[in-house]
């Protein structure tokens, strides 16, 4: 049986890793401007508008959220009860008491999943706090230079401490 013949996928990361883990080249080996450009394209493809700034250590992508931003701005979680809200502060909710479930993919995919694979986070996310706020992606030029606070928020030991 090959990987496409499986009747159902497991939600266990060990099983999903076979299907979704990136291969070559590793994301952290790509130049930061290429990594930032890939994220910008995804945001624009989801109908977001993105502003890019740069400092010595990182690219800062500030965007009006596309799909998830509209969920926050239009309030379907409150108005129609159509979407779940995660209410367990921790790494996948950015330590918040409430986060629309849709927004959790921004902690899982670029932050938690790479760490589980022994890699570095692809970008550091700061989701919108309230309607109208932008979401932020920090794309570090040197992936080993991420602040210790990032690793602590993700429930990990910072590399500088290890």
Language model features with spans:
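N-terminal accessory segment detector
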Residues: 1-134, 141-162
């Amino acid at each position: 049986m090959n990987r496409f013949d499986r009747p159902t996928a497991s939600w266990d990361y060990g099983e999903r890793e076979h299907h979704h883990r990136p291969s070559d080249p590793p994301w952290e080996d790509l130049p930061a401007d290429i990594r930032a450009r890939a994220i910008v394209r995804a945001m624009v493809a989801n109908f977001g508008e993105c502003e890019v700034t740069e400092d010595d250590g990182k690219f800062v992508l500030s965007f009006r959220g596309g799909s998830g931003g509209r969920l926050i701005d239009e309030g379907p979680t409150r108005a129609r009860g159509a979407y779940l809200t995660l209410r367990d502060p921790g790494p996948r909710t950015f330590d918040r008491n409430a986060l629309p479930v849709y927004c959790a993919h921004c902690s899982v995919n670029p932050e938690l999943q790479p760490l589980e694979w022994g890699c570095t986070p692809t970008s550091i996310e700061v989701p919108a706090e309230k309607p109208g706020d932008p979401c932020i992606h920090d794309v570090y030029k040197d992936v080993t230079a991420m602040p210790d606070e990032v690793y602590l928020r993700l429930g990990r030991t910072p590399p500088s401490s290890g």
